[in-house]
From Swiss-Prot:
May play a role in mitochondrial aerobic respiration. May also regulate mitochondrial organization and fission. It is found in: Mitochondrion. The gene is mtfr1. Residues 165-189 have a biased composition (Pro residues). Residues 168-296 are annotated as: Necessary and sufficient to promote mitochondrial fission. Residues 101-121, 154-193 are annotated as: Disordered. This is Mitochondrial fission regulator 1. GO terms for cellular component: mitochondrion.
Amino acid sequence: MSRNHRRIEMDLAVGSSSKHYGSSRSIVRRIATNLPLAPCPRVHFQLHPFASGASFLNSPNGPNVATLADVAWIDREESDGPGRIRCEADSGLVFRTQERRPLRRQRSLPSLHQVEPAQQSQTVINDEAIQKISVLETELAKLRAQIAQIVQAQEQSAQSTAPAPGGPPVPPPMVPVPPPPPPPPPCPTPSMQRSYSAIDLIRERRGKKAEQNTVLDSAPKKPELPNMLDVLKDMGKVKLRSVKSHQEDGNVKAKPVEPTDAAAMIAEALKRKFAHRYRNDSECDGTFTFTAFENKPHVETPLFGQHMLKSTGRRKMH
């Protein structure tokens, strides 16, 4: 291998003056070097000592990371931009390969992050179920102990009521533990509920009302007070008639009608005042006659009417 490397170096050294290699071999290559093209991906080889062989890579003591001492050459084209003009030949051993493709993550593999929550939820559910089962077991144990105490107390009470003759004294009975509460009554079956329809309910209610009415009718009735609404209900149909009193006219004296006119009242007052004088004069002369004011028929004036209106000075239009 060392001889081949020496031959390659000699060939490169000899051909450096004539420039019959690389980009100076033809016009096409010269034009291509002047074009701003991106370089193709290249393969880099790392040289290791031949004595160590493949065991050098697998040895735990040796460094597996490449260093500058292990690299034979460094490709400087990666750091250069695409606009670099390649005027000189690249040094080193170069092999053209395909472009490097980024590694894709395989989605078919199960992800640990998605599996962990499901396992945690299953463990939580299992813990809750175990706790419920343990609570039920403790309740069953308590009920069994209570039942055993009740049975034992009943047996002891039976033995104390009928003691054997000449036998040992019976120990005092233990205080009985209160029995557990009775279970709730069973719910009626749906078939019974369906048969008990609304028609039956109506019939039962009517029967109850009829029984109540019969009980009320059989009970002694109290004297009820007359209702005024019933008394006054037919008052509009009653017709009234005038009744004259049959009394003798001789026994009853007609009352003098008092005058309502002011002039008549004054004349009546004067007549009463000077009645004794008129009597004396009439006895002496016998010819004097008192002319009393004639009673004019009194006309009642209405309270409201045209007499209350004030005159405006206009003529009445006929």
